[in-house]
């Protein structure tokens, strides 16, 4: 992530807080106004606020279904054009709700907010974040509502960051603006030792390290996207995982934590999105592995374990 920002915006007398809300948090009118009240209360407490929002509920899946009704082989570029629409709906509705509550807000698409990416359609990576527009809106004492998950590449084409990309968008903004806090709101109250929706008697963790969270995310824990944790670790952005439905203390994700109880195991995760590929008759000669993994990389396939 190349900042290239010049002077970073920061009002000395106000904290800057980045808040991210997932699709379930804005899935209908009641949830949208619930989020709007959380954001408005944060702003009214004397903070500058940037909000990053995902597409509503199952919108992304619904858009994928609509594409499949047209063609079974859509181009990645056109899929990004389609999928980016989900977040644009969310940011507009949330900005309307905030304005309805008397909290002045401006919605920005990913490209309006300054996200620049590479050309890997549907799985793009952020290359630069130009924050001038966000900063100018904050200077006007407005809440800035940003569409997560999306950006613009060098061809001026819309790109998306892949599943969980809104988490990455939020962390990138927090890093670029040197935010005081980066809060990730979900439908659970923090990071648990296992998924509380599937396992009984789980325990919520008050703190967890970036490395531990990254391991859980890589193994299938759906609280945070693993790319967002990688970015948070790189720029040392502390994350706070909270519930948008229950105002209780959540889990802080940071570089170092005090392990008072000496827990041997912090958490258990299950990953069902895994495929096993067996390659037979591989020649034992230099360069073979490079060719194989090069082909996988071209298709944006991550290799987790080699046996």
What is each stretch, according to the model?
Residues 235:
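Active-site scaffold of zinc-dependent metalloenzymes
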Residues 10-229:
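Nucleotide/pyrophosphate-binding catalytic subdomain
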Residues 232:
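Acidic-aromatic/histidine active-site loop/patch
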Residues 47-51, 224-227, 238-244, 248, ...:
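Flexible, glycine/charged-enriched surface loops at secondary-structure junctions
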Residues 53-60, 241-257:
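Terminal amphipathic helices with adjacent charged low-complexity linkers/tails
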Residues 149-150, 188, 243-245, 257, ...:
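A broadly conserved detector of short glycine/acidic/proline-rich loop/turn motifs that flank catalytic sites
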Residues 1-12:
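Single conserved hydrophobic/aromatic residue that forms the stacking wall/gate
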Residues 250-307:
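A conserved regulatory-domain signal marking ACT and ACT-like small-molecule sensing domains
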């Amino acid at each position: 992530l190349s900042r290239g920002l010049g002077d970073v915006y920061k009002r000395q007398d106000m904290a800057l807080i980045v808040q991210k809300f997932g699709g379930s948090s804005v899935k209908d009118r009641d949830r949208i106004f619930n989020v709007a009240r959380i954001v408005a209360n944060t702003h009214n407490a004397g903070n500058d606020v940037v909000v990053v929002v995902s597409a509503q509920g199952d919108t992304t899946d619904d858009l994928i279904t609509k594409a499949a009704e047209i063609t079974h082989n859509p181009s990645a570029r056109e899929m990004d054009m389609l999928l980016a629409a989900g977040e644009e709906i969310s940011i507009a509705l949330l900005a309307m709700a905030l304005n309805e509550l008397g909290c002045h807000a401006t919605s920005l698409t990913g490209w309006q907010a300054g996200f620049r990416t590479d050309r890997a359609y549907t799985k793009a990576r952020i290359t630069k974040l130009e924050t001038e527009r966000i900063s100018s809106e904050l200077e006007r004492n407005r809440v800035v509502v940003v569409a997560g998950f999306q950006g613009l590449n060098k061809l001026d084409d819309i790109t998306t960051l892949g599943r969980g990309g809104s988490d990455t968008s939020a962390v990138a903004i927090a890093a670029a603006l040197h935010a005081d806090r980066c809060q990730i709101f979900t439908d659970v109250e923090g990071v648990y030792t296992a998924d509380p929706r599937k396992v009984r008697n789980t325990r919520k963790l008050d703190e967890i390290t970036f490395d531990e969270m990254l391991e859980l995310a890589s193994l299938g824990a759906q609280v945070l996207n693993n790319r967002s944790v990688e970015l948070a670790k790189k720029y040392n952005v502390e994350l706070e995982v909270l519930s948008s439905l229950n105002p209780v203390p959540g889990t802080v994700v940071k570089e170092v934590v005090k392990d008072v109880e000496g827990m041997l195991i912090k958490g258990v995760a299950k990953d069902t999105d895994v495929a096993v590929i067996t390659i037979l008759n591989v020649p034992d000669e230099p360069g073979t592995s490079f060719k194989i993994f090069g082909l996988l990389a071209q298709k944006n396939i991550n290799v987790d374990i080699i046996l």
